[in-house]
């Protein structure tokens, strides 16, 4: 931190470890934001992909362990925790999903736990994971963004997956004709065929915007909240490095207070992402507009 400007420190912590096609024709890691930008579309954020997969595996292993040790007798702490979590998600699905599908509850559970784990990485001190990446790589300037949900590519990827399910179930339940009719015959209608035909472009524009807004808002809400939270942690670290917080006790209070508040944020954002997914899929299962 001492060798970096505040701006450089912030940019370094908010830059992804990007692997792609370098300008010289080789494949490798970008060391600057400019190099990452020049890689174009076929660039991979290795840190985001790595943490997402690793946390997904942790989720699977924990629940597999709980399932293998499940007993009808005196349950252990892990089984109690998993049962409470499953009942909470199951109750949320029953309250908000009005169709019939064996997929929705497991999907909601996966989304809630996975997003929560990805958000929770934000509670790790901002320099720990990047420093570990530097030690492993031997490169003091390697960028590394530890929190997957601060990468819009991750949140948009999850949102587009939900969007694909919305389209799939809309067509499955309503049929192609019903899906097209939902986009073109509502919200405005008329018994006059000529007037109805004139209203089709207006209806399509309104319904299409509403449909596309679902994944975009889903992705940007999660990304915006987590990015802002990570930025606050980084700014507190910058203040330490700048000597502005010469009272270490005040610094500890700031870090602790924001971390405690952030626990609420990471949980709430995981819950909101899950609930909106349930609601959107419930709307897709409704046969009537």
UniProtKB/Swiss-Prot annotation:
The keyword Transport applies. InterPro entries: ATP_syn_F0_a_bact/chloroplast, ATP_synth_F0_asu, ATP_synth_F0_asu_AS, F0_ATP_A_sf. Pfam families: ATP-synt_A. Keywords: ATP synthesis, Cell inner membrane, Cell membrane, CF(0), Hydrogen ion transport, Ion transport, Membrane, Transmembrane, Transmembrane helix, Transport. The chain crosses the membrane at residues 43-63, 101-121, 160-180, 193-213, 232-252, 259-279. GO terms for cellular component: plasma membrane; proton-transporting ATP synthase complex. It is found in: Cell inner membrane. GO terms for biological process: proton motive force-driven plasma membrane ATP synthesis. Its main location: membrane. It is a multi-pass membrane protein. GO terms for molecular function: proton-transporting ATP synthase activity, rotational mechanism. Key component of the proton channel; it plays a direct role in the translocation of protons across the membrane. Belongs to the ATPase A chain family. F-type ATPases have 2 components, CF(1) - the catalytic core - and CF(0) - the membrane proton channel. CF(1) has five subunits: alpha(3), beta(3), gamma(1), delta(1), epsilon(1). CF(0) has three main subunits: a(1), b(2) and c(9-12). The alpha and beta chains form an alternating ring which encloses part of the gamma chain. CF(1) is attached to CF(0) by a central stalk formed by the gamma and epsilon chains, while a peripheral stalk is formed by the delta and b chains. This is ATP synthase subunit a. The gene is atpB.
């Amino acid at each position: 931190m001492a060798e970096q400007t505040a701006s450089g420190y912030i940019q370094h912590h908010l830059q992804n470890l990007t692997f792609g096609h370098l300008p010289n024709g080789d494949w490798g890691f970008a060391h600057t934001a400019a190099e990452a930008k020049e890689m174009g579309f076929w660039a991979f954020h290795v840190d985001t992909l790595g943490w997402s997969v690793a946390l997904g595996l942790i989720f699977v292993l924990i629940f597999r362990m709980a399932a293998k040790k499940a007993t009808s007798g005196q349950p252990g702490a892990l089984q109690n925790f998993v049962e409470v979590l499953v009942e909470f998600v199951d109750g949320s699905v029953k309250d908000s999903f009005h169709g019939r599908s064996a997929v929705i509850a497991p999907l909601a559970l996966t989304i809630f736990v996975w997003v929560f784990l990805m958000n929770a990485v934000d509670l790790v001190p901002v320099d720990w994971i990047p420093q570990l990446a530097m030690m492993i790589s031997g490169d003091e300037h390697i960028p590394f963004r530890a929190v997957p949900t601060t990468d819009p590519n991750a949140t948009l990827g999850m949102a587009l997956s939900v969007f694909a399910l919305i389209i799939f179930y809309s067509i499955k339940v309503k049929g192609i004709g019903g899906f097209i009719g939902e986009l073109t015959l509502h919200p405005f209608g008329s018994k006059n065929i000529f007037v109805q035909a004139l209203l089709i472009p207006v209806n399509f524009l309104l319904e299409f915007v509403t449909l596309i807004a679902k994944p975009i808002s889903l992705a940007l809400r999660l990304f915006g909240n987590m990015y802002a939270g990570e930025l606050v942690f980084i700014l507190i670290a910058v203040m330490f490095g700048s000597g502005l917080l010469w009272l270490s006790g005040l610094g500890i209070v700031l870090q602790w207070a924001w971390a405690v508040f952030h626990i609420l944020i990471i949980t709430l954002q995981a819950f909101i992402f899950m609930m909106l997914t349930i609601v959107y899929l419930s709307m897709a299962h409704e046969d009537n507009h």
